[in-house]
Amino acid sequence: MRKASLLLLVPLLAACSSTLDAGQQYDGGDANYVMWDESERQDPVSASGTTFEGDDINLEDLRGDVVIINTWYAACPPCRAEAADLNAIAEDYAGDVTVIGVNVRDNAATAQAFERSFATPYESIDGTDGSFIADLEGTVPLQAVPTTLILDAEGRPAARYIGQINPEIVRGMIDDTL
């Protein structure tokens, strides 16, 4: 019986591990965030999508800028809780950083109501078909919302924060990426 229990535990523990956490922890042992040294960064990522307003956004067109990508949806409690912090970051770093939201679940009316309610100063891509996040596979967990990804000026993943952000930590990551 004990051997059978152990055999059941092995796949469960293996499922909890992830190669997404490769890289250097930015500060402390919090596994929710990671920042990669410049020499360890992956190749530039390529993804594109259309905002709820009908504008096309292509990450390749943003090379030369530091880009912050944040996945969210309107009914997500941590997404709502971090909205003011992301707005402040977008405003404080305007001109140095491009912030893009990726709504992974809502229809246009719901997403736009959220953006109006929180006075979001940046556009969000309609990511409900999953293709934008799928293009970031290996960098952003497909089901982890919210996730915030910071790309360096070359378009390479520099840092990632899974869950509701701590704005001081994310600001430090941005400063180190700039």
List the model feature ranges, each with a label.
Residues 1-48:
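N-terminal targeting signals for export/organelle localization
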Residues 33, 57, 133-136:
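N-terminal post-signal-peptidase region of extra-cytosolic proteins
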Residues 37-67:
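A short beta-strand-turn-helix
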Residues 57-80, 86, 99:
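Short active-site neighborhood of thiol/selenol oxidoreductases, capturing the structured segment around
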Residues 71-73, 102-105, 127-128, 164:
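Active-site-proximal beta-strand/loop segments in catalytic clefts of secreted hydrolases
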Residues 80-119, 129-135:
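Structural microenvironment flanking redox-active thiols in thiol-disulfide oxidoreductases
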Residues 116-120, 128-176:
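Thiol/disulfide oxidoreductase modules built on the thioredoxin-like
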